[in-house]
């Protein structure tokens, strides 16, 4: 068996679990303001600047660490662009656009409307549909759901991406779903064109300005290089952890994604800007990222949700009570299906 075929959400919508009126009332109070998004942006750029200055002023031996940390905080800026696409980064709509587009989307070579179309209009409503969910289609096309010999599977989804083997595929995914996609009937063509030419003007200004100031090499070494290396690697694993392998067999929204419970180091590298609260986001996309941990605490009043929450681990590491990591779950699923395929082939051989 090369491809799992138990896709229950093909051409159908997931079932939304209902919470009590009291829980929903508490959740409704979690709304964006006009300050916190800007504070998180300032934090991200402050760390990136600190990494740059430490390398330039202390030692170039710090450069590999700087590239890792800058990539991690660039990934954090993805959360900023993401919330702007959902219009939850700031209460004021114009401020939401300014923060999300100029300080996150454009610097990460993404366009706001492309992000909104692929994520808000395609990923969220068609979550788990192997024909319409762009995120799921990407990981299916790149072998995450293929059943392979266990060592080969581990190499393909873990070691190969760590050493850059999935970077071109992930870049193509970003190009398609975060930059070039425009096919949405409910968006004005003028907004998309403004976004498109605004992106080009932004980068012309950055490159021309840095060249004029003699800082072009700084932009390349401390922004472009991390973006093309660690940002891509971290992006692969973070997005892998959001829904894999749950979309293959689940139909209820609380089982289609997860919050992650990694340790401090894993959260520092793979969870900037509370990136680990992905289930909370899908359950309440109108809540800004900095309040998702409060949303989880509110939902923990529901016994069914609390039971689901007790099953989560980290991405690479076990959870606080020994819950299996995402990587362990993926490897175990592949091992089980691979052994099943061998047993089926053996049985057919005996029948023949």
From Swiss-Prot:
InterPro entries assigned: FA_desaturase_dom, Fatty_acid_desaturase
Subcellular location: Cell inner membrane
Annotated CDD domains: Rhizobitoxine-FADS-like
GO cellular component: plasma membrane
Record-level Gene Ontology MF annotations: oxidoreductase activity, acting on paired donors, with oxidation of a pair of donors resulting in the reduction of molecular oxygen to two molecules of water
Disrupted gene: phenotype observed: Mutant can produce serinol and dihydrorhizobitoxine, but not rhizobitoxine. Mutant produces no symptoms of foliar chlorosis on G.max cv. Lee and does not accumulate rhizobitoxine in the nodules or upper shoots. It shows significantly less nodulation competitiveness than the wild-type strain on M.atropurpureum.
EC number: 1.14.19.61
BP-aspect Gene Ontology terms: lipid biosynthetic process
Membrane topology: Multi-pass membrane protein
Broad class of enzyme this protein falls into: oxidoreductase
Domain of life from the UniProt record: Bacteria
Reactions performed catalytically: dihydrorhizobitoxine + 2 reduced [2Fe-2S]-[ferredoxin] + O2 + 2 H(+) = rhizobitoxine + 2 oxidized [2Fe-2S]-[ferredoxin] + 2 H2O
Keywords for the protein's UniProt record, in alphabetical order: Cell inner membrane, Cell membrane, Membrane, Oxidoreductase, Transmembrane, Transmembrane helix
Any Pfam family the entry gives: FA_desaturase
Membrane spanning residue stretches: 53-73, 89-109, 204-224
Family (UniProt): Belongs to the fatty acid desaturase type 1 family.
UniProt function note: Involved in the biosynthesis of the nodulation enhancer compound rhizobitoxine. Catalyzes the final step of the pathway, the introduction of a carbon double bond into the C3 position of dihydrorhizobitoxine to produce rhizobitoxine.
Protein name: Dihydrorhizobitoxine desaturase
């Amino acid at each position: 068996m090369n491809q799992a075929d138990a896709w229950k959400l093909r051409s159908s919508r997931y079932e939304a679990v209902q919470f009590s009126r009291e829980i929903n009332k508490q959740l409704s109070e979690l709304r964006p303001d006009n300050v916190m998004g800007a504070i998180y942006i300032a934090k991200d750029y402050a760390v990136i600047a600190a990494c740059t200055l430490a390398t330039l002023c202390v030692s170039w031996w710090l450069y590999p660490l700087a590239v890792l940390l800058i990539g991690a905080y660039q990934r954090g800026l993805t959360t900023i662009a993401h919330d702007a696409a959902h219009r939850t980064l700031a209460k004021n709509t114009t401020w939401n656009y300014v923060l999300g587009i100029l300080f996150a989307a454009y610097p990460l070579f993404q366009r706001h409307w492309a992000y909104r179309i692929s994520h808000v209009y395609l990923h969220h409503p068609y979550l788990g549909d192997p024909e319409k969910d762009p995120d799921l289609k990407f990981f299916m096309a790149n072998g995450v759901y293929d059943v392979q010999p266990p060592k080969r599977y581990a190499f393909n989804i873990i070691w190969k991406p760590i050493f850059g083997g999935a970077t071109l595929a992930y870049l193509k995914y970003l190009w398609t779903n975060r930059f070039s996609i425009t096919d949405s009937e409910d968006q004005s063509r003028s907004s998309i064109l403004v976004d498109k030419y605004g992106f080009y003007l932004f980068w012309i200004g950055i490159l021309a300005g840095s060249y004029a100031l003699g800082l072009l090499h700084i932009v390349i070494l401390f922004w472009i290089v991390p973006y093309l290396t660690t940002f891509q690697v971290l992006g692969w694993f973070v997005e892998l952890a959001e829904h894999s392998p749950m979309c293959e067999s689940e139909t209820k929204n609380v089982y289609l994604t997860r919050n992650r419970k990694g340790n401090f180091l894993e959260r520092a590298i793979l969870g900037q800007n509370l990136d680990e609260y992905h289930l909370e986001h899908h359950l309440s996309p109108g809540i800004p990222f900095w309040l998702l941990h409060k949303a989880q605490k509110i939902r923990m009043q529901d016994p069914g949700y609390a039971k689901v929450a007790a099953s989560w681990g980290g991405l690479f590491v076990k959870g606080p009570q020994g819950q299996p990591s995402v990587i362990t779950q993926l490897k175990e699923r592949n091992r089980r299906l691979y052994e099943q395929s061998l047993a089926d082939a053996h049985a057919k051989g005996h029948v023949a």
